[in-house]
Amino acid sequence: MQTPWRSPTRSTVAVNGRLPEHEAFRRRELRFHRYAYWFVNGVHVSIRLGKDDKLCLLVVIGVREDGTKELLAVEDGYRESTDSWSAVMRDLKARGANEPVLVLGDGALGTWAALRDVFPAARRQACWVHAIANVLDCLPKRLQPRAQTMLHEIMEAPTRADAALALERLRDELEAKDPKAIAKLDRDWKHLTAFYDFPAEHWRHLQTSNVIESSFATVKLRTRVTKGAGSKTAALAMAYKLLDAAQERWRRFNDHHLVADGLAGARFKDGIRVTDDDNDDNEMTDEKVAA
């Protein structure tokens, strides 16, 4: 039976101000599992700390080879800066975390700059929920329902080519009315469509960072109703405890055996695994075209 969460007290907080279990979490070895996907996000949570009344939580969730989601990091950062994210990623690497195949996040620039520095081969997938919200924010309310429908058609397209065609339909309808909305999609298109190079069974998981967003909602609610954490360290400990409890409810990846395939280097096109026979057929087609 899980022990109910209680606010940290002097008797439960370690010498450096952290909960003992949080300190153990921050120091544990990560070399015993391999992680194919990461979900990363930073959210500012309001707490009562006098002048410094914002806690920026930097959270990393990994997907293990068996498809299980695991909380890897909960740290405080300075406005999701590159330095803050680099520190988190370097620490994970030092404790044995492998380079992920794909990292999903909401698009904060500091996150991606740190990823390029620490794990340069990892690919990036932008969150479609954030992308859709950003486009709709550019449009007048009368255009938003139609635009939202078309944006979901893009996100749910069965192939990358179909998604591109759906984008052009949206462009034809909206670009003259608000070119900034389409420009947002054009800018991030490569990262919005990276999921097509991974198993179709995983697309639902890889299109949004909802696993973090829903967990953060619990943290935000708790920090709003409490009288105040009193310190950044105590608030961080509370966030860790709530997220640690939340991971018991996180859904395992569909067709989880495909996670291991991705780690082993299997390649996918539009969600379907590419075999050596497919490569041979493509090469023969290219030769015929050249002839």
Regions found by a protein language model. Give the residues of each.
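RNase H-like nuclease fold core
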Residues: 5-8, 12-105, 109, 113-114, ...
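Conserved phosphate-handling catalytic cores of large alpha/beta enzymes
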Residues: 133-159
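Acidic/histidine-rich catalytic cores and adjacent linkers
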Residues: 156-291
